[in-house]
Amino acid sequence: MGSGSSSQWMRSGSSAAAHSRAVALRDRGLRALKIRFHHPDWRDDVRVVEAVRAAVGDGMEIMVDANQGWRMPGDLAPAWDLATARECAAALEPLRIHWLEEPLPTADLDGYAALVASTSVPIAAGEMVRQEHEARDLLTRGGIAVIQCDVLFCGGIGGCRRIAGLARELGCSWSPHTWSNGYGLVANLHAACALSNHGYVEVPYDPPAWSAERRDWMLPFVLEIAGDGTIAPPPGPGLGIEPDLDALERWRVA
């Protein structure tokens, strides 16, 4: 049975807190982590990345999520423009990050192409991609290095397989975003184990607000990351899991 290399997500927070959290994850065997920007000034987030890189050295991959791909109704600040994305990418170049994720709105294909041409930092995008043509545009017109489509959103395992195959033909990788629930994680793990160009599988984990128990509440067990930083899909037929019907019963409305 295969397994996927996992990356874990953390909000940038303070430099000191991120430093200690990153060291703890590294000591657990994690090979990679992703830092999500959230400060009003992205330069403060870059300082957090600097602290994490200093803490873990080159022993872990660091991904950075600028979180500019789409907006929530309550988001008051505008998305980054190309100039901001370029400036941020330039600041991150010395920190040897694995990728810069969604530094521009998903539909800004010309912006992505210009950014890719101006930086050595690999650019990732596409976590909310629903259709194959959207992924194709990001890969061919936008020139991104990593497509992040999720099995739950892009037509299931079959749809994701087609997109990952397109990425492979273009010399790009697929790394599922997987920010959903235990079922989504299991489905993406199975797909990742079957596809040769997958990179890391993102594992939602940001306690106490987002714990493994909260993520996997519908499953009969909690998915655990092994000491070598990998996570294996359940071994049974199909997805290898049955829903926890008792857990679902509490949400019955009729």
Which ranges hold each PLM region?
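N-terminal capping/lid subdomain adjacent to the active-site entrance of alpha/beta enzymes
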Residues: M1-P94, E213-A254
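Hydrophobic faces of well-ordered beta-strands that scaffold small-molecule active sites
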Residues: G2-S7, R31-I35, I62-A66, L100-E101, ...
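Active-site beta-loop-alpha junctions enriched in small/polar residues
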Residues: S5-W9, R36-P40, D65-R71, D75, ...
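Hydrophobic alpha-helical scaffolding
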Residues: R11, P78, E102, A125, ...
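Conserved, mostly hydrophobic/aromatic
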Residues: L33, D65, L100, L138, ...
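Glycine/Thr-rich beta-alpha phosphate-binding loop at enzyme active sites
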Residues: L92-P103
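Shared catalytic-loop signature of beta/alpha-barrel
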Residues: R96, A107-A124, V129-T230
